[in-house]
């Protein structure tokens, strides 16, 4: 097993924000060996199907949230990734749309791992409305606060003035 820690990047953000699109871009353009851990909240792991054609080792966790009900499975998946040969240089964790990225990122400090960044993806067209929603608003605000980097996606769907207002928000 390698003595160099595996860099960990967590991708979070609410449902439909563009997490899988960002992950696919990373996989297409990366010049390093990447392992991917995908967590979907429902019974069907849609995100895993969307990234299956990309290079890299992919482990999926379905029907629960990485940060609460799947802790044992998540720990087991991390052990599997750490045992891969050759060792991946980076682990990208795509958390479910309802997960708290900060909780998931805490695993990036485990043995043999170094947390690189927590990236939160937001949908420019819907972020302000969804952030005020009585059911999901607190989750979205919490996700935004936990990000080291916030990626505003779908900016082509809003005018320049709205994009600027969201950026300042």
Which functions belong to the PLM regions below?
Residues 122-125, 147-167:
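G-domain G4 guanine-recognition motif of GTPases
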Residues 139-148:
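Membrane-proximal helix-turn-helix segments that form the acceptor-binding/catalytic region
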Residues 2-12, 17-140:
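Nucleotide-state-sensitive switch-loop elements of NTP-binding domains
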Residues 85, 166-169:
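Short secondary-structure transition/capping segments
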């Amino acid at each position: 097993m390698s003595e160099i820690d595996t860099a960990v990047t967590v991708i979070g953000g609410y449902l439909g924000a563009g997490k899988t699109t960002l992950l696919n871009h990373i996989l297409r353009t990366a010049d390093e060996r990447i392992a991917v851990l995908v967590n979907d909240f429902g019974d069907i792991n849609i995100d895993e199907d969307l990234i299956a054609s990309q290079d890299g080792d992919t482990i999926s966790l379905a029907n629960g949230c990485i940060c609460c009900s799947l802790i044992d499975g998540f720990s087991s998946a991390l052990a599997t990734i750490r045992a891969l040969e050759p060792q991946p240089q980076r682990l990208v964790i795509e958390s479910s749309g309802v997960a708290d990225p900060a909780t998931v990122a805490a695993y990036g400090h485990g043995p043999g791992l170094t947390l690189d960044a927590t990236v939160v993806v937001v949908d420019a067209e819907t972020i302000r409305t969804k952030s005020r929603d009585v059911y999901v608003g607190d989750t979205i605000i919490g996700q935004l606060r936990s990000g080291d980097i916030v990626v505003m996606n779908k900016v082509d769907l809003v005018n320049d003035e709205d994009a600027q207002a969201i950026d300042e928000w």
